[in-house]
Structures are given as C-alpha cells and as structure tokens.
C-alpha cells in the first residue's frame, strides 16, 4: 500500500508511475477522498474538544453557583453527544473507503525498470549456460513422463479434474529430491531459516502480501473463510505482521518448501497439457525482511541464490528484468529466471524475484526501530521462488533426456535418489 501523505505531496509522480504500468490516473480522486476524510476527522476532533471544554465549564459554572449557565452548557454537551456518532461514522466510512482505494493501487516501479506493455518488452539481463546439443529429437515433459510410465494425468483428472498430476515411483522421488536439494542449498549455504508454516491463512495475511482484495479470484477459499496459500510468500512475509523489529537484527531471511494453490482464473486455454500450469504445485520460496537501505542489494543477492539452483542443476537459463507492464502488483522491480525447455523450444519462467519496498510492510503494519534515531519505519520486503519444483522437474526431464527415452539424474541430485542414476521406462 502506498502512503497517502506521499500521494498528497506527489500527485504527478503517482499518475506518471501508473501510466508506466498502463493504468489510469488516480491522484486527483484519491486526494479529494483524503480531503473529505481529513475534514470529517477535524470535525470529530472539534466536536470532542468543544464537548470536553463545555464539560469543564459546567463545573466552573456550578462552583460559581451560576445555574443558568450550567444548564445552558449541559444542553450544549447533550447536543454535541447527539452529533458525534454521525460524524464519527462518517469518519469511519471515509477511512475505510480510502484504505480500500489505496489497497487497489499497484506499487511504484523503480526508475531503472524498463517501461513497456507486456512480456515482449522485458530485457534480457544475462544468459547462463548453453542449449543441450543432441542427435535425437527433443520431447515435451508430458511425452517423456507418460512414456516412462510415471506421470499420469488421466488418474489425476479422475481424482481432481484438470490441471493436476499424479507422479509415481522415481518421478515422485525426483520431485522430492529437487525440493530437498533447494531447501538444503538455501539453508546451508545461503543463510535462510527454514520455516514450516500453515497452508491456510486468514484474510489479513493475504491482504498483507497484496493478494487481497484485488486478486481474490486467483485464490482458493475454504468453507470456513480461510485461504489456501498461493505461495509461501504469504506466510513467510506475514511472520512479522504487527511487529516492531530491531534494525540490528535485519535482514531476516526465511525459506519454506510448500504446496501452492492457484485457481488460474485468467489462464483458460494456456498450457492445458502437462505440468506447467497447475492448481497445486510444490515451490521453494525465499523471503527477506530488510531495512530501506539494504533492500536493493538484497534483491540482487536473492536473485543470485535462485540462479544458483539452476546453475548446479546444469540448466541453461536467462535472467530477465521485467518491464513496468509485466511486473507484479506489489513489486518495485522484478527479475524472472527463465529456463530453457527443449521440448517447447522456448524459455519458460521458473522463478520470479521481487523487491517490494515498504508496500507490504505498510499493509502488515510491520516496522523496525532505527538503530540511530530509534524511530519506527516500515520494513522493506522481498520475495522469490528458489525455485518452482514442478517446473524444475520439467526442465530436468527435457534437458536430461537420452536417445532411448531414459532420463539421466543430474549429479547434484544423486545423494537424494537412493542410488538411482537414471530413470528408465517402467517394467
């Protein structure tokens, strides 16, 4: 959420930032709504002040035995008490209306973010590795998995409908190995604290990370009103909600390996075959809680941590700087890691690492106490996939495919595979 004081002082800057994102100007309507709210607040404060003063004057009038003045003041206090509830209700309604409007405004992009409309305007920041060179034809992951006999979409559909997958035998183990490798890397070498947290959260949590109120249709909700997490970003970031941290203890770095649940409401007709776009998938999430000064450097560090996963797996990938039109709602700057999929003859997103400024900190009322001036400031937050496990599985299948249809296990995963070095067709 943006600071209304900043919007009041910088209306042109807000509208310019919204224009970069392809959104309509909002500063004028927000400032007008804020003026109405502030007027209602002032009215309520004036009435309260006059009521309190009149109450004191009653005592003085009584002490002076001026009963006529005392009665007049009592009548005034009574009238003020009658007026106050309506003014206070107006204040509450206008405050709620303003907060709702602010909660639907996207974050302000950094100045160095390329301006663009969609993914076609993203910039290649760096490319790592090379495409595999084979004598045999590449295949898509679902062709490989089904031919091996360990990837079953038909039974998954019988259980749950479309956009689900059943993995068995060595493919199930490979998925588990990938997730375990990621968690081990980030905790043992990258300094992240592993967290086991709930998969269902309250409204306040998804509001804090900015999925609510704007993106409710992308989420799954339980009958008792809780939300299935679309990413562990929600739980990891909200660990510090309503807290005041010491600046000396920052940054906090959390990681979790969890299922994620997404309705894919806007994805009809996209990636309908295979595992690329699922309602339920495993993901290793990275979250950092920092002060204002450290956030940009932390963003580069987090992205490097995610890249290291792909480097150690020997996968060809590129890092993209997203343009303003392709960035997430809460982001100030985002790097996407796109892994090469030979079967699709294309790069596909496997990780997204974003720096959010104090956008989420303000929504969560999460603050830190400055080590010098001791004032409380909103924390800055970052999140990234380190990485999406299912998409990593896809990349391994397509990049480590052998001519006979078997799949070689990447060396870094061998300690997790119980002696298995290759996945071959089921007997």
From Swiss-Prot:
One of its GO terms (molecular function) is serine-tRNA ligase activity. It catalyses: tRNA(Ser) + L-serine + ATP = L-seryl-tRNA(Ser) + AMP + diphosphate + H(+); tRNA(Sec) + L-serine + ATP = L-seryl-tRNA(Sec) + AMP + diphosphate + H(+). Its EC number is 6.1.1.11. CDD domains: SerRS_core (cd00770). GO terms for biological process: selenocysteine biosynthetic process; seryl-tRNA aminoacylation. The keyword DNA-binding does not apply. InterPro entries: aa-tRNA-synt_IIb, aa-tRNA-synth_II, aa-tRNA-synth_II/BPL/LPL, Ser-tRNA-ligase_type_1, Ser-tRNA-synth_1_N, SerRS_1_N_sf, SerRS_core, tRNA-bd_arm. ATP binds at residues 262-264, 349-352. L-serine binds at residues 231-233, 285, 385. SUPFAM superfamilies: Class II aaRS and biotin synthetases (SSF55681), tRNA-binding arm (SSF46589). Pathway: Aminoacyl-tRNA biosynthesis; selenocysteinyl-tRNA(Sec) biosynthesis; L-seryl-tRNA(Sec) from L-serine and tRNA(Sec): step 1/1. Homodimer. The tRNA molecule binds across the dimer. Belongs to the class-II aminoacyl-tRNA synthetase family. Type-1 seryl-tRNA synthetase subfamily. Consists of two distinct domains, a catalytic core and a N-terminal extension that is involved in tRNA binding. This is Serine--tRNA ligase.
